[in-house]
């Protein structure tokens, strides 16, 4: 059982309608679940056109940029985003490399055209200034000594709502330090949300700065016109540029260190309660031109704080990297892991896993299509590499690996066995559900935990040790608090993770050993994705039948599950109970493992 991998896709034998080499009809009729905020067609998407976006600034640019797209006065969710890049090609490419190179060659000219206001987009869609909300306070409390302390250099980058320049500190502790300064005009901050976005970006950078794979934050300044964010200057270029230099393809051993660095910083962010929400190759920079230079995550303009039991609902990010649950407006940190899966797919094969001619078509592909693992080079890559990418790209976020788990996947672990694995904050969500579960479900989870495979046990042992068990080998509320406090940043306080710990009050007066921790932390949906699930669940039921099963009437079962009085329990739960002896049936056992009682839910959405 130690060799279990994830189940192959049930549709792997079918042709992927969005895979390279197929014909692509124009798809404009897709909309997310909330049609009131569905994407607004752009002029280039309204008819057949040789233009299609390769990297779009956001899957919801109608929300973030209405003034540009439809002349409206919509709110801007982000002040920094990647400019729209359009590529002049009519047919679906097998690899992004060739025409991205063409786009890069044209980038300078397009920037100049954008600055002069003569791009195709601006000539077809007149722009209007967004109306500013009344009574906005644009004071941030940052230092106002920017011009006396910093000497600005040339512009090195530009987004929709700001631009970046090289600069040098003229005095103070950082005298002589060359930095990058992100400049955000206050005239662009036309809503309270936009102002809060800037404030939150600075908070996140300040709190998380210091991680080796995250851009170093130095200081924030403001004057009457702008906000200035001084950060580390990374001179090695974007990860995207390195991908292009290799012709859009990495070997497995070359891809691993890139993916490890991305996973490291994302796992750290998630541990601190921060979700990035815009992970893509453009948002990772190398510190120098050297081949083995460090990779740094940048652009936290769309990032947010999130608790383990909290879900976000605003659509942000970049179309090719956006997770299905983001389009459904209910997501958490797993959405970042999906984006890493897309990056890993591109690194290993040079193509995007989801493609269409229009933004709405991309969204449909993300929601409905399965990425192809049949075309070269996938048949020639290792089974571990394919399993790794597939487990990052499960459409059901409950089955998807976390960033910490991905660092312990056999494909990664075989490359580097001496990594510091961050604590997986989502384990607290599993523990909360376990502690609030009925005694019957706890017994079922304990039985299932006896069937864990070697890789799962190794991962849980690592996570258990990070919670600093006491001399008796038990974790308690005190050991958990101390373990978190030793690694906490201000971001963890902002995301209210310490408050969430109060929900683990079942550990207030007792400890939890490793055996019970396995039952509490096991992810049933992830375990189900393994190809040994059928064998595992049958064996677990046998153990449960011997040690935990008992006679139970339907009304008691309904009460334990938290089923309300409006539910016809006899018809719903009839098959859950074995008619011969009144004990839980195999069907009921499986359902009980998957089901979470009303008492164990209580997740919040914002």
Curated annotation (Swiss-Prot):
Ca(2+) 1 binds at residues 470, 472. It is an enzyme of class 2 (transferase). The keyword GTP-binding does not apply. There are 3 contiguous domains conserved in the CDPK subfamily: a kinase domain, an autoinhibitory (junction) domain and a calmodulin-like domain. The autoinhibitory domain (418-448) inactivates kinase activity under calcium-free conditions. May play a role in signal transduction pathways that involve calcium as a second messenger. The modification Phosphoserine is found at residues 318, 585. InterPro entries: CDPK_Ser/Thr_kinases (IPR050205), EF-hand-dom_pair (IPR011992), Kinase-like_dom_sf (IPR011009), Prot_kinase_dom (IPR000719), Protein_kinase_ATP_BS (IPR017441), Ser/Thr_kinase_AS (IPR008271). Its EC number is 2.7.11.1. Its main location: membrane. Residues 98-110 have a biased composition (Basic residues). This is CDPK-related kinase 8. Residues 455-491, 492-527, 528-567, 570-599 form the EF-hand domain. Ca(2+) 2 binds at residue 516.
